[in-house]
């Protein structure tokens, strides 16, 4: 029969797969166009290095680190539309343009106060997207009136919480940690989780 590749061989192979292929696979499982999309980020814990490595660098405790996932999430189909993975701390706004460039949103973008920026709202208006982004607490009454006049609704905003449910479902089904040591191995690992999540929902759609 056929020889089964070892785990290390599979890990080496996934590193060689270019990013555009992972993006294409994710899009094929999520669809091409999305009406209402939420944006947010979450963290995946990373396995600690070996005891000998920790001892060699004179550390008494394990090294705390995590991988950050920023994502766009279709609140209607509950699927992940686009993702960005980082292994170093970054502000949520760093990956917004990257994600929006890879996603065709037809109606609404939901986001929490971490995404409250004038340039992002203007970008959404240019793309004919309605931004439902919660304003910061220190916003002036005048600016708040402007935002409300342009379509912001507290009732609609609550749909943003669906992306948090999506992150929770992703971690429950496929684990909240990653075993890769660098971004080249962590990226495909998280992409696989998101793709598997989308496929499981697609299977439910087909057979129900």
Regions found by a protein language model. Give the residues of each.
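Charge-patterned, long linear interaction tracts outside catalytic cores
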Residues: 181-208
């Amino acid at each position: 029969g056929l020889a089964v590749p070892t785990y290390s061989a599979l890990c080496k192979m996934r590193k060689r797969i270019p990013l555009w292929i992972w993006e294409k696979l994710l899009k094929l499982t999520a669809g091409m166009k999305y009406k209402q999309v939420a944006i947010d980020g979450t963290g995946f814990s990373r396995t600690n290095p070996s005891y000998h490595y920790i001892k060699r660098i004179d550390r008494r405790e394990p090294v705390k680190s995590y991988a950050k996932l920023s994502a766009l999430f279709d609140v209607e189909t509950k699927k992940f539309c686009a993702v960005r993975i980082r292994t170093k701390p970054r502000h949520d706004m760093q990956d917004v343009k990257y994600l929006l460039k890879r996603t065709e949103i037809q109606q609404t973008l939901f986001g929490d106060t971490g995404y409250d920026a004038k340039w992002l709202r203007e970008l959404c208006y240019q793309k004919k997207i309605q931004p439902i982004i919660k304003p910061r607490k220190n916003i002036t009454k005048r600016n708040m009136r402007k935002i409300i006049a342009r379509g912001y609704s507290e009732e609609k905003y609550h749909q943003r919480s669906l992306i948090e449910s999506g992150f929770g479902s992703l971690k429950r089904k496929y684990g909240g940690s990653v075993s890769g040591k660098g971004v080249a191995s962590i990226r495909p690992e998280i992409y696989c989780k998101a793709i598997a999540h989308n496929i499981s929902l697609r299977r439910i759609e087909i057979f129900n």
